[in-house]
């Protein structure tokens, strides 16, 4: 074996190793560029509210209008919107609901309640349950407010669920407290959202987009 042949032979392992490293790097970049699309199903999603007064506790519901989210696990960045039909709110009492829509929510003027998340704090496991905190903008009564809410997320290959509980200090946020002289109502309302839908893996075209 001449000198040139010997040198070329010695370079082969390094070339193979270099190719392996390039493939590994490419796979890491591809994984980090992958995003997950969450579609919310109105039939499987529930929005409940609880409001207390001096006599009893009022329980009611709202309906999901639409919802779609895009999540990047590598960065925790999330985008999209969850939209609730404000006009769908009901508590089982027609008189109370009419007052809620006319005086508190003003749902004819502000027909939607929306949450636009922008960041997830904590890791979301690709399978099973995870406890995270979701940051974003919550819009109610025509005003955006920044909130951070704890969420319990459960992932499966083709579907997902998330349970969120948070408090809306509606009176502090400028909405009317429906209290009367003889019936005092709490200044805040408890919200329980259980969202569910489908999952789809996607690959981002460019991190700059």
Sequence positions of predicted segments:
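Bacterial N-terminal signal peptides
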Residues: 15-28
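Bacterial N-terminal signal peptides that target proteins for export
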Residues: 2-18
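Low-complexity, acidic/polar, glycine-enriched regions of mature
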Residues: 31-209
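Intrinsically disordered, low-complexity regulatory segments enriched
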Residues: 6, 19-20, 165, 178
């Amino acid at each position: 074996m001449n000198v040139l042949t010997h040198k070329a032979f010695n370079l082969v392992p390094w070339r193979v190793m270099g190719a392996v490293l390039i493939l590994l790097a490419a796979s890491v970049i591809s994984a980090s560029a992958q995003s997950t699309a969450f579609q919310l199903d109105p039939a499987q999603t529930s929005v409940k509210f609880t409001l207390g007064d001096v006599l009893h506790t009022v329980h009611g519901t709202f309906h999901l209008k639409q919802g779609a989210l895009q999540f990047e696990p590598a960065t925790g960045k999330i985008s999209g919107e969850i939209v609730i039909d404000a006009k769908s709110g009901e508590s089982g009492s027609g008189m109370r609901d009419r007052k809620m829509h006319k005086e508190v929510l003003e749902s004819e003027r502000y027909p939607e309640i929306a949450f636009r998340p922008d960041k997830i704090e904590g890791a979301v496991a690709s399978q099973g349950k995870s406890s995270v905190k979701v940051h974003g903008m919550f819009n109610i009564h025509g005003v955006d407010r920044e909130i951070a809410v704890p969420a319990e997320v459960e992932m499966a290959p083709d579907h997902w669920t998330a349970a969120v509980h948070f408090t809306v200090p509606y009176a502090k946020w400028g909405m009317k407290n429906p209290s009367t002289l003889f019936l005092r109502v709490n200044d805040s309302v408890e919200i329980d959202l259980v969202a569910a839908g489908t999952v789809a893996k996607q690959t981002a075209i460019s991190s700059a987009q």
